[in-house]
Every structure is written in structure tokens, then in C-alpha cells.
Amino acid sequence: MAKDIKFSADARSSMVRGVDILANTVKVTLGPKGRNVVLEKSFGSPLITNDGVTIAKEIELEDHFENMGAKLVSEVASKTNDIAGDGTTTATVLTQAIVREGIKNVTAGANPIGIRRGIEAAVATAVEALKSNSVPVSNKEAIAQVAAVSSRSEKVGEYISEAMEKVGNDGVITIEESKGMETELDVVEGMQFDRGYLSQYMVTDNEKMVAELDNPYILITDKKISNIQEILPLLENILKTNRPLLIVADDVDGEALPTLVLNKIRGTFNVVAVKAPGFGDRRKAMLEDIAILTGGTVITDDLGLELKDATIEALGQASKVTVDKDSTVIVEGSGNPEAIANRVAVIKSQIESSTSEFDREKLQERLAKLSGGVAVIKVGAATETELKEMKLRIEDALNATRAAVEEGIVSGGGTAYINVLDAVAGLELAGDEGTGRNIVLRALEEPVRQIALNAGFEGSIVIDRLKNSEVGTGFNAATGEWVNMIEAGIIDPVKVTRSALQNAASVASLILTTEAVVANQPEPASPAPAMDPGMMGGMM
């Protein structure tokens, strides 16, 4: 395929047009008075959203050179979303500001490489200043504030802080669509896995169709149990203790299952059998997790263990187990806390080294099951369009909250960027590197300017007053008042704030140092097929 090539100023100006189109579309959503953007979908109702990365991903421009500029900014939003989970609109605004100021200087004859070095040095200084201004997030109220700011809903803030309190910072919090109109929180404490009882005759509550075992022993094996004789010695020993038994095995079939069911119905023995969760190597890992959580041992050929030789000492224990037709929940396992902590540390290191998104997600689920539980926020709304928009906001809020717990918070509303201006201005750089520093100084003002503009105020006036105010004082665009931002609950996670700036500077520098752009030539429209002469007979 033939290529179109543009050089120097012509190449950069084409890309900048694309940057501006995308950024101008996204930045109207910034701040508490940010507007919505309506996205046409190929089927179903349009999506109404103020989520920066969702909007950025939808934009495709006809001009190939402009589209490349737009896609680079979209990459900034996506990367910020991947790292911090929020701050995508801020990252887009910062990218546009750095590109706009940088292009003026490059066009005037400045060396783009020198400018790039200056930008990198200024951003590094700004990031260090942001980190030093950080306030740790330690209590439930602070977590609720972070979530409320991101989602623009105090109720959502309460749900997220409650969920994190219940399942811990490493716990799994999932967001699902509710069947009703109300948003609600459902917390499953303990370890849950998606395997239910193998026979409905094992239930202890016929009305709810669940089996509840109090203080049970837990047999954990990756073997298939077909012959009851294999576990008979173990069953006889458990029978003497008068305690129930949960069997987690590859499968229970043959004569073993009906024998267990018969003894359960007769009241001889309270037992529930479930299949082991997962598949392949993941199944082995999950069985090991269950064993560590409950203080048991996995009966497996890998360790040279046989079912017929198993003793009560090899069984796990828990305060309660609940099993329904689809899932099993183990509450308060009797495992050694130190062994559990070591297992958690191993899984965390696997998450960090994993390159697969799917593997990382599964490892995160295992981590949550070991360290707390699972919380589900069920989102309710009057219409499908509102539901989609609400779900996106809650996802952003959850990500922002996790980021806040990780690295702390700073004043929100763009104030944190104004508070680091002095640190950046104190950086002694000369020539084009000094120009790069000045570009960052101007760009750091842009989020506040845009938030004020979206709320109907003059950005320059707000910035001038901010520069002369005490550190921590900022402009509440929602009310038009000047307040202590952290005390007023207007806060941003440091991780979000710094990621937005770092990613914006990285991509903007690439655009400024671009000297040639290569794009595919548009394909010529195929000519209409010639008409069959026989079709013209009636036209004479």
C-alpha cells in the first residue's frame, strides 16, 4: 500500500489538530460542573458519559495524520486509566497544554530535544513535590470522600468505603448491574468459590436449599473419589467426633456419592461434597489456598499422599461453611496466620510479575479470598443509559479510592498542581531546557483553568488568587467558594495526579520531537460496475 509522508512543521501541525479535536471533546467533562458527552453506539441507545477514557477511545478521525495525534492522546488517557484508574480527563488536558506551548517554541526555532529534557526534569520535580505534599488515607471517612469526589455521589462514596472496610484493601470489589432501581452493597465474607453441592439431598435447609455446616472438618484432595472404601477409615474417625464434613475433591461419583447421601438422609453423618474449583494448575493452586486457609493438607499424588492413609490431622477446619447449588463459602478457616500471610505475599509477587491481564485478574481474586472476602456493588438505575453511566462512575471511584489508599491524597480541583509551581520554578535550567520547564509551569495551571471555565468562572482570575493563597486553600467550583480543599473533602489521589502528569509529558514530548509522519494513503473509491447491456433493452 502506498504511503503519505509529511515532514517537520507540516507533520507536527497535522498531529496537533488531532490532539486538539480529541482534547476539546474530552475536557468539557472536567470538574464538578463538567458537561456530558453523548456517544453514538452501533446498536442500542447512545451512551451518555463524562468518563475521559471512554470518550477518547470512541474518537476516530477521517484524516490519517490528525487521527495519529488523537490516538496518541487516547493512549495517554488509557495508560493513566490502567495505572491509576482515574484522572484520564486531567491527563488529556495536560497533554494538550504541553503540546500547544511546546509547538509554539519549536516553530519559533527552539530545539525540541532540549525542550524535552527540560520537560522531563520539571515533571520529575513536580512529582517529588506532589509526593511530599501527600496526606495518608487511613480512615473510613477519608476513603468515602475520595470515592464521593470521583463518582460525584456521597452514597457511592459510602458504599465503596464500607466495602473496603469489610474486605480489606486487597479484597475484590466487583460492580454488577442490579435488577432493581436501587444501588446496593452485598458482602460475602470468607473464601467463596463457584462450586455447589453434588446432590440436593445434602442440604440442611430445605426452604433455602442450602447446606450449612458448623465447625466442620474439610477434606481437600485433587483425586476423584469413586470407592467409599478409600475414605471409610477417615469417615469412621470423624463420626466419633460428631462433627460435619465438607469434601472438596476432583469429583465424587460411583458408589461413593449415593453412600454419602444415604448416610446423610438417615442422619448418621452430616456431609457435603463439592467439586474442586478451577482447572489444571489453577485448580491445584486454589486447593492449596483452601488448605492454607483452613489449616489442612491437600491429599495429592504430588505429595505422595493417599486417601486411605488420611488422618484427621490432615483435614482443614472452619467455624462455618455454607454451600448452595452454585457456590461454597468457607468462613473463619483455622489456618496459621503466618502461613496465610506468606501465601498472600507469594500471590502479590506473582501479580507484580504477571504479564497477562487474565492471569493477574485470577491472582487478584485468589488474593482477595485469602485476605478478606468479596464485595459486590449492585448498580440500579431507571434506564439502561443511566445504568451504564453510573457503572462507569463507580468503576472510576473504586480505582481512585484504591490509588488514594496506596499513595495518599492531595488537594483536589487542580490545586495540587498549583501548589508545586514554586518547586518547579526553582529548578535552574538554561536555554531550551529552561523553555521546557516554563512549558510545564504553564501546563500545570491548565486543569484549574478548565475546571473554572466549565463551572462558568474566569480561569485566570481563579489561578491568580490561588497562587497568592495559603497551601491547601482552593476554589470549590461546585459552590464558587474558597475553602481548605482537604477539609472540604475535595481531594485527589497522589497516584492519579502524578500519573496524569507523567503520561501527559511523555506523549507530548514524543509529539514535539516528531520530524516525520508516515500514514497509509486512503484507498480510492472502487468504480461502479459496468451495466449489463441486456438491462438497457427497455430504454431504447
Swiss-Prot record:
It is found in: Cytoplasm. It comes from the Bacteria. It catalyses: ATP + H2O + a folded polypeptide = ADP + phosphate + an unfolded polypeptide. One of its GO terms (cellular component) is cytoplasm. Keywords: ATP-binding, Chaperone, Cytoplasm, Isomerase, Nucleotide-binding. Pfam families: Cpn60_TCP1. It is an enzyme of class 5 (isomerase). GO terms for molecular function: ATP binding; ATP-dependent protein folding chaperone; isomerase activity; unfolded protein binding. ATP binds at residues 29-32, 86-90, 413, 476-478, 492. Belongs to the chaperonin (HSP60) family. Together with its co-chaperonin GroES, plays an essential role in assisting protein folding. The GroEL-GroES system forms a nano-cage that allows encapsulation of the non-native substrate proteins and provides a physical environment optimized to promote and accelerate protein folding. This is Chaperonin GroEL. It comes from Streptococcus sanguinis (strain SK36).
